[in-house]
Amino acid sequence: MELRLYNTLTRSRDAFRPYDPSNVRLYVCGPTVYDLAHIGNARPVIIFDVLFRLLRRTFGDQAVTYVRNITDVDDKINARAAERGITIRELTEETYHWFRADTEALGCLRPSVEPRATEHIDEMRLLIERLVASKHAYVAEGHVLFHVPSMPDYGRLSRRPLDDMIAGARVDVAPYKRDPMDFVLWKPSPEGVPGWPSPCGIPERGRPGWHIECSAMSWRHLGETFDIHGGGIDLVFPHHENEIAQTRCAFGTNMMAQVWMHNGFLTLEGEKMSKSLGNFVTIRELLKDWPGECLRLAMLSTHYRQPINWTRQGIGFAAKTLDKWYRIVGDEPAETGEGNPFEAEIADRLADDINSPSAITHLHHLADVAEHVDASSALKRRFKGAANLLGLLNETESQWRERQRQAVAVDPEAIEALIAARIAARKARDFATADHLREQLAAQGVVLMDNKDGTTTWEVAR
């Protein structure tokens, strides 16, 4: 199996060859912890979790380091803490735990390291001082700024004309800047705002700019150069472009990460998601109505580089698919590893630039094989193991049913009693009573599915 990944830097799908196969290193930009994560934030979390799983399968569990940072110093954090009347630490701790609970509900593995920006201020100062010493940055009015013209191939990642970059960066053309494109590495902290001793002999307290945070954390945990850097397409410019500039100029390297991966935008029911349009949806809100696994399957049904239109219909289809798959595997354990040919077939499809739609299509085929009346327990275990590579079917059927019921406001025992009465009526050929009971359940929003084996499963129509 050859792993091929689309590299934003080269604009091509290239064979992935890590610097060191025994030490594969992945960095992904994580959340700024000031509010609940929205469904758009879930996309990179899920996509790079699948990549993490695939890398572990390919190179070994202990050979892969996945770093996803936590930005806990930011002007939005300061403003939200003041608005709520709580400390910045209280806000960031609360929001981090919300984010962690949401990602666990989505079936994501924890990254190897989740570094916090506030724990890496020393590394940021060191990087900044290196940049000033090498004439790639300068001090001006209590700020330290990166001098963009000092890097001849700045813009190589985004490939945007200079005028577009100036507009896209929404730069503040302050009078102390040597060039309009220069960006902040360090800035003064006014009274009441978090601050630390400044680098470069600046006497006033200050705080880091956004871009230097990721350069410092990736350097600390992965080194001067590493294998893969990921994030949303909106981060290509200016954030990732500026990360590259800082890191390469600080260490004199010709590369920061050899592969840059970016997931596409998300729209909600065909519209851009925004609070002003009233269609801003958090992961937490969706988890009230759906198990996280439904959200995961719906997200993976579109290739990560393509835009995705997030719809309730899509989540509903994912729920029906998972209901069928769990019914097939029952409470069988998963068979994982090199001995599972089904898992290898899914891995081959994911190796083609994380082609999750192709992998899911093949899972539908494998489900039909495992559902066959003569299918052995081994086939079901292999099917479940194959789905596990996508982070799916991680529970038993019993756990799945219970999770479905927890997500809806119905009385499961009362529903099961009505279903049992309907089954008894059908066996007695009392179809009028059976139909009446089905209608009674439908009035509560309960949809019944009569299975080939004579059992009946149910779900709540949303």
Question: Where in the sequence are the language-model features?
Answer:
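Alpha-helical recognition segments enriched in aromatics with Gly/Pro capping
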Residues: M1-Y34, V45, D49, T58, ...
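N-terminal, positively charged nucleic-acid-binding surface of large information/translation enzymes
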Residues: T10, Y19-G107, W458
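Short, well-structured beta-strand/strand-turn elements
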Residues: Q62-T65, K135-E141, A370, V447-M449
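An alpha-helix initiation/capping motif
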Residues: R68-T71, T118-R125, F237-P238, I315-A319, ...
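Short, glycine/charge-rich beta-strand/loop segments that flank catalytic centers
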Residues: I70-V73, T95-F99, L109-M124, G142-M151
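The substrate-binding groove and active-site-proximal loops of carbohydrate-active enzymes
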Residues: A81-I88, S112-T118, G232
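Structural preference for alpha-helix termini/caps and helix-kink/transition segments
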Residues: K272-S274, G278-R462
